Each structure stands twice: as C-alpha cells, then as structure tokens.
C-alpha cells in the first residue's frame, strides 16, 4: 500500500505541475514528504482501504488544506489566492509548517474530510458568470438571485466570492 500511496502522490504532483498549479503541487509534495517521514499524513492515510490513485488521496489532503484556509486558518489562508493570499516558491518552508500544524490540530476533522471524494469541478469557469451577470444587473438594475441545478453542487453560486485576476490590454 505504501508504494501505491507514493505513486498517487507522484502522479498528482506531476499533474499539478503540468497544469500550472504550483501551490497545489507543493501542498501535495509537502504531504508526500510528511508521509515519507512517517508524520501526521502517514498516520492519516495508513491502512487506506481503496486504491489511493483512483480515490484521489493526495487531492483529498490538498482539499482539506484549502478547506481549512477558506474556514479561516490564517496560517494557510495567506498562501491561497481564493483567500486573498499569494504563494511563491520561497514560501514553501512556511507552507510546510502551516500544513503540518493544521493536520496536527485538526486531525479528527481531516479524518472526516478524507472519507469523501473531492469535488473537482473547475470553479475558474465562474469568471464568465461574473462578466455575464454583471451585464444582466447593469441592464436590468435589479438584484440577482440564483439557483443552480446541476452537477457543480452549487460551486458557481459563489462566483462573486472568488478572487479574479483579469488581464487588461
């Protein structure tokens, strides 16, 4: 099982690198290092019952870290753009400390979180919603109320709470 977990970590790190997601790549990589040292991550995933690659164990760990940042963990939030933070490669040692701390402090919550597969819908698509809904609001002059019926589990209902970077000519 240890080899399968290492393979899952390697695969996810590579995918994040190819997709240009340095923060998630480093979160997964630091969890991988912690696992290899026998730290809290090894304790959390020891005895995993399924296939760690198919079950997206590394993404579950990364998802928990992001969830904690969104829930107000200031030590992690400072790295996540979705929380108004910024991550740079030089921050990796501080990120390692923050990750170890949150997994240690929130071990029970992490165990509960790891039971569920991650929601992997791409919320970046919400940028188009922001533009479209801004135009609708401008034209109608009315407040916008939304309901989402579909596969994204309401993620796009929060389009106004995401952080956007727009390129301007």
Task: Describe these PLM feature segments.
Residues 1-145, 152-169:
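Rossmann-like AdoMet
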């Amino acid at each position: 099982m240890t080899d399968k977990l290492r393979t899952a970590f390697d695969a996810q790190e590579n995918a994040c690198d190819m997709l240009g997601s340095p923060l998630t790549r480093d979160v997964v990589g630091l969890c991988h290092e912690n696992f290899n040292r026998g730290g809290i991550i090894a304790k959390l995933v020891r005895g995993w019952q399924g296939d760690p690659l198919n079950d997206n164990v590394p993404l579950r760990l990364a998802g928990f870290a992001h969830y904690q940042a969104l829930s107000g963990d200031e030590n992690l939030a400072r790295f996540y753009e979705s929380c108004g933070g910024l991550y740079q490669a030089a921050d990796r040692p501080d990120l390692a400390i923050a990750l170890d701390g949150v997994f240690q402090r929130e071990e029970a919550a992490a165990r509960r979180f790891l039971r569920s597969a991650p929601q992997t819908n791409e919320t970046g698509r919400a940028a188009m919603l922001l533009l479209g809904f801004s135009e609708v609001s401008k034209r109608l002059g009315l407040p916008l109320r939304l309901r989402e019926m579909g596969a994204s589990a309401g993620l796009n209902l929060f389009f106004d709470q995401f952080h956007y970077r727009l390129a301007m000519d």
